[in-house]
Amino acid sequence: MIAQLVIAFYFIVCVGIILINCFTEIISRCRSCVLKRREQRYCEEYRQLFLENIAENKKQEKRLVKELHSTSRLLTFSEALYKVENSMPEQFQQGIASVSRLMEELIPVYERKSDMEKACLAYVFAIFHMTKFQAKEIVFPFLFDLLGNKSLYCRENALRALYSSEDIHAVMQALTFLDANEQLLPHEKILADGLLSFDKKEELIPLLWKKMSEFHPTMQVSLLD
């Protein structure tokens, strides 16, 4: 009799665990679907905002900046920009300059956030080449601070953003800084890819050759490879 009660109790516990797991999985999937639909809605809203020229509507501009204080919204906004860039490249080129300058307002906010969130902002700056439209005195201090960060993700995205600025002197300053702090050097592929994609490489290469003998072997190998 006792054995039967133990077996029955064990069976009930097992069934209960299975039901709880099933319920948890259903809730998780429902939540995931809701979040996905919400992100899709935000993405479409941001896409429309971009196409309507955000900078011409100060109320919308203020609301957007406030929303982009959230890193998840920032990444959703970047997804919207990516869609516009790929589907309507002309409209993207017409609007990206004003949006880039608007994004400068996020720097003081993200400076107080975690390293990963700071890196996300630098990543968005880099992939859309926003830094070439932004005020150097605002964006460069932020990026150079990230370049000296202990987080590799911060350093790599900061360097990408500096490359995308098309500012030769900023790139040379970044490479010189990394050479003087070899422990901060990102993967050599990041260094090489940045040089290959740099729009003003014809002007940059002579400066690099002039400086090459002063660089440490590690930096020399990274640049020459």
Please provide the spans of the model-predicted regions.
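N-terminal signal-anchor transmembrane alpha helix of single-pass membrane proteins
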Residues: 1-40
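Long, contiguous interaction/recruitment modules in multidomain scaffold/adaptor proteins
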Residues: 23, 147-148, 155-156, 160-188, ...
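N-terminal topogenic membrane-targeting module
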Residues: 24-115, 125
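Amphipathic alpha-helical repeat scaffolds
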Residues: 47, 51, 78, 107-111, ...
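Positions within ordered alpha-helical repeat solenoids
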Residues: 48-56, 83, 127-130, 164-167, ...
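Amphipathic alpha-helical scaffolding segments comprising HEAT/armadillo-like alpha-solenoid repeats
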Residues: 61-66, 97-110, 133-146, 167-179, ...
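Structural detector for internal amphipathic alpha-helices that build alpha-solenoid repeat scaffolds
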Residues: 79, 87-97, 119-131, 156-166, ...
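Short inter-helical turns and helix N-cap capping residues of alpha-solenoid HEAT/ARM repeat scaffolds
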Residues: 113-115, 150-152, 182-185, 215-217
